[in-house]
Amino acid sequence: MIARHDQSAILSQAVEHGDTVYLAGIVATDLSKDVKGQTKEILDEIDRLLGKCGSSKSKVIQCHIWVSDIRNRVPMNEVWTEWVDKKNLPARACVEAKLADPKALVEIMVIAGK
């Protein structure tokens, strides 16, 4: 079974396939926030989407993080460290990339189990 959630004209924010949940790349909606604020907003949205799919941050398997400037990795990691389930750390990559909106400082994509 495949279930798609929060669809737009071009993508689904979350897709369930069997016991796996795939989240699209999530960016903050309030791009006036600093990197910590954007990261917090993104992680809150990840919590919401995972919950909608019957999952949680404790079941995150893999996470890809893009930052517009690698120097933002340190403040992003401060927020990440407060959020992540320390007993169930996912595989993770964090790289610098030019994001679609120049005001976006962070984008996070997650794969989780149920």
Briefly describe each language-model feature range.
Residues 1-61, 67-114:
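N-terminal presequence-like segments and the immediate start of the first folded domain
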